[in-house]
């Protein structure tokens, strides 16, 4: 009986690893496509400037970014999104859309996918592409 449970756990771990690999590959392909399309901001300052101008729809932070730097960047991102205003019907109205920040991939993987070196923070400029990246990750996780 105990051996059977160990075998089940091994199968589950292998399945989780395979799903993780598939999700990662699809995600990396999509951010590579975004880079080739010119729909990416590279690095912390470019991403923050893009957010302030309302041009960034998704911010990607590498999961192996040092914890202090990651926390600092998350705070800056949240602050930038909170201060984002759009002009609507002649009135300034605070943007209330979801903050799309994901922590995924390593710095090396993400940088390689977009053809740059040492880029732990990447911003996706195209709203539809950002939704596609998020949707594809969620679909893979849900098994759809």
Language-model features: locations:
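Acidic beta-strand-to-loop metal/phosphate-binding motif
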Residues: 57-63
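Ribosome large-subunit tunnel/peptidyl-transferase-proximal elements
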Residues: 2-55, 68-74
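Helix-rich interaction surfaces within compact, conserved domain-sized segments
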Residues: 102-144
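Mid-chain, well-packed structural core segment of small domains
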Residues: 80-116
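Gly/Ser/Thr-rich loops at beta-strand to alpha-helix junctions
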Residues: 64-67, 129
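A short, gly/pro- and small-residue-rich
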Residues: 69-88, 140-141
């Amino acid at each position: 009986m105990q051996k059977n449970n160990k075998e089940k756990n091994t199968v589950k771990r292998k399945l989780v690893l395979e799903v993780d690999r598939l999700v990662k590959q699809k995600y990396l392909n999509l951010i590579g496509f975004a880079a080739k399309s010119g729909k990416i901001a590279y690095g912390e300052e470019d991403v923050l400037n893009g957010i302030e101008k309302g041009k960034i729809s998704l911010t990607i932070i590498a999961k192996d970014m040092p914890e202090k730097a990651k926390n600092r960047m998350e705070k800056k991102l949240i602050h930038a999104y909170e201060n984002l205003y759009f002009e609507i019907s002649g009135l300034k109205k605070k943007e209330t859309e979801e903050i799309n920040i994901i922590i995924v991939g390593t710095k090396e993987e993400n940088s390689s996918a977009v053809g740059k070196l040492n880029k732990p923070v990447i911003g996706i400029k195209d709203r539809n592409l950002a939704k596609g990246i998020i949707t594809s990750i969620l679909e893979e996780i849900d098994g759809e």
